[in-house]
């Protein structure tokens, strides 16, 4: 994510809102945000509403907003049910770069379909552990397999590894 100078704030949202589960609920998604640049109020430090993951319904997510000011290299981790969003970048020249990684429970469908979004040649260059982290694995003997096979073994066999 790279909000540039003059970027509007992102609307407050929850990253697990697309799962039809009553609230509050057990954590479904863990969000991580790694700051590549300093996060300041001026360049749009991420906004979070502490405790909002415990709400049964939206109350007023614009109350009690915490701004995650942090130094480059810092990591912010939060429950995907927490209301959050990127702040407005009111600077004239600063880009606020970050790497955002979301992890959901293994039995839930991920938000992005990386199986077709990442070229197979790129996947082939990844270590097996990273391939499994992307989702080339089974949850148990029934969920996530391909023709009753482990997806990583299936993928590797198709590419003669």
Task: Name every feature range the model reports, one short phrase each.
Residues 1-47, 59-77, 82, 87-161:
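Conserved double-stranded beta-helix
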Residues 20-22, 44, 57, 86, ...:
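Active-site-proximal flexible loops/turns
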């Amino acid at each position: 994510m790279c909000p540039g100078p003059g970027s509007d704030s992102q609307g407050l949202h929850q990253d697990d809102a697309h799962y039809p589960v009553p609230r509050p609920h057990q954590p479904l998604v863990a969000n991580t945000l790694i700051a590549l640049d300093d996060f300041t109020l001026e360049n749009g430090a991420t906004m979070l509403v502490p405790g909002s993951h415990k709400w049964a319904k939206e109350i007023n997510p614009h109350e009690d907003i915490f701004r995650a000011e942090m130094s480059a290299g810092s990591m912010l981790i939060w429950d995907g049910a927490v209301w959050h969003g990127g702040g407005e970048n009111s600077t004239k020249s600063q880009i606020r770069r970050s790497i955002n990684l979301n992890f959901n429970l293994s039995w839930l469908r991920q938000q992005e379909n990386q199986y077709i979004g990442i070229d197979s040649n790129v996947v082939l260059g990844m270590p097996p552990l990273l391939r499994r982290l992307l989702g080339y694995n089974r949850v148990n003997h029934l969920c996530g397999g391909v023709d009753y096979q482990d997806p990583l073994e299936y993928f590797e066999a198709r590419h003669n590894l």
